[in-house]
């Protein structure tokens, strides 16, 4: 199997495209530019907010105009790690993907499928002409990996949808309806040196 055999073909086409675009957390300017150009190319309303979140709207297909607006959401940054023997600059170098058996992998670096596969899914839906749907809003948020900056910065009115589906999940065919969330805790402790007590050995006891 090679990359052209991966299904859904349109999703993996766009995943390969965004693998050519550097997108480290807090340095997403190139992928933001890519998304804006994508929106213009397909004649879709596209806007960004002050932190870089991108929203691309797609009108409903004929007969579906009265359905509720659905928001599809994914984050555009990725975890950037590489093997110690690999030379790779995540600010300028593309991700080199390869099919290994049934897996799509990256050569010596993280792949960026979290959440690149979600981004690619949204792009495939936006570009599709054979999918019936109601009004769609595709939301691409920044800096999820190091602080959820994009999500926390969203303001009322940026989206208008009634339903939001987050595509940052790891289980195909399963839908999560809730989660416990996460939290960061910063703790400070003051330490003072102390002498550790050690019990005497049997030999020391005999000597005494």
Question: Regions from the language model: what does each represent?
Answer:
Residues 2-103:
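Acidic/His- and Gly-rich active-site-bordering loop/insert found
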Residues 21, 25, 105-114, 174-176:
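Flexible, glycine/proline-enriched loop segments at strand-loop-helix junctions
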Residues 64-140, 144-145, 151-162:
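Active-site metal-coordination/substrate-binding segment of hydrolases
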Residues 140-142, 167-169, 189-191:
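Short, structured patches in soluble enzyme cores that scaffold and shape functional sites
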Residues 156-175:
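A glycine-rich helix N-cap at a beta->alpha junction
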Residues 176-185, 189, 194:
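TRNA-recognition modules of translation machinery and tRNA-sensing kinases, especially anticodon-binding
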Residues 197-204:
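Conserved small/polar residues in nucleotide/adenosyl-binding loops
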